[in-house]
Regions:
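Beta1/beta-strand and adjacent pyrophosphate-binding region of the FAD-binding site
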Residues: 5-22
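Conserved Rossmann-like nucleotide-cofactor binding loop
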Residues: 22, 45, 167
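Glycine-rich FAD pyrophosphate-binding loop
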Residues: 31-51
Length: 301
């Protein structure tokens, strides 16, 4: 093993695969109970993650339980109201309660990095550029094979938490993945800048006739930027590969252009991702392995 790499052979109480919000939240919670926790992630932080960037009331309450400080996120934007547009064109403002925080927007690249920093500060060992390969489970522990910067290593843990997303390599390696499963929903998003219309300060949800029961959104960020996108249910009635054409059309609709302003500029490339939302049917644990977040298909719960 190269001398500049950490030795991961020491036994830990919990090994978590994936340093997204589900993984870091589990790690922070466990380390506060006096457990020895290690997280591995194939990425190097900060890294982006395809997401709408909106934080619901439940998400904010969970962050409060972690004693997370929004001030550690440069682009954190509190939301005081949601603006909805019906398929018929009627617009409605829904104010948030004024006795706390009930919605916010923050880029995942910033939020996830801030949670990684907090987890490290509380004693969690986080190993980046470390890819999960396989595991061997026995009655007392789990031996996990990983690839750390192209160097094979093994980690032994009493328990494993798989927070490794929709495609969950851990779930797949245990033979628990459903063949052909692509999620219940599919979403598409991109960032825009030079937003001079009302979208630069409003959280907007458009219920478009052709997207129902899905919807489109524009979530405000600092410096006249927004996260804009749409999501549709996988019901077999539309081809997911046609989403790019839907996106092009959506950005030309008069009410969307009016909200963004005439000179908005789309940034970089668009991204799309599947959304698993069937936790009631999902296998959330197997022996010494637990699944959380998207790996547990827990969207919207």
């Amino acid at each position: 093993m190269p001398s500049n790499l950490p030795d991961l052979s020491t036994l830990c109480d919990i090994l978590i695969v994936g340093a997204g919000p589900a993984g870091t939240a589990a790690a922070i919670t466990a380390v506060r109970q006096g457990l020895n926790v290690t997280i591995i992630d194939k990425a190097v932080f900060p890294r982006d993650k395809c997401c709408g960037d909106g934080l619901t009331t439940l998400a904010l309450r969970e962050l409060e339980k972690l004693r997370f400080d929004p001030a550690t996120v440069p682009s954190w934007t509190d939301i005081d109201a949601a603006w909805l547009r019906s398929p018929s064109g009627r617009e409605l403002r829904l104010p948030m309660p004024n006795n706390g925080k009930f919605a916010a927007v923050t880029p995942r690249v910033e939020l996830d990095n801030a949670l990684v920093i907090q987890a490290r500060s509380e004693g969690v060992t986080i190993v980046e550029d470390c890819t999960y390969e396989s595991m061997a489970v026995n009655s007392e522990s789990v031996c996990v094979s990983v690839n750390l910067k192209n160097t094979p290593q093994q980690i032994t843990a009493s328990w494993v938490i798989a927070a490794d997303g929709m495609w969950s390599p851990v779930r797949k390696s245990l033979g628990l993945s459903e063949s052909g499963y692509l999620g219940e929903w599919h979403a598409f998003r991109q960032y825009a800048n030079n937003v001079t219309g009302v979208a630069n300060e409003r959280l907007i949800v458009w219920f478009e006739k052709d997207l129902l029961p899905g919807y489109a959104w524009s979530f405000p960020l600092p410096n006249n930027r927004v996260n804009i996108g749409f999501g549709v249910v996988r019901d077999g009635k539309r081809r997911i590969q046609d989403m790019k054409d839907v996106w092009t059309d959506l950005l030309q609709r008069p009410h969307v252009v009016e909200a963004l302003g005439p000179d908005f500029v789309m940034e970089d490339r668009h991204t799309a991702w599947p959304i698993p939302a069937r936790i009631d049917e999902a296998i959330t644990g197997s022996g010494r392995v637990l699944f959380v977040g998207d790996a547990a298909m827990a969207t919207d719960t």
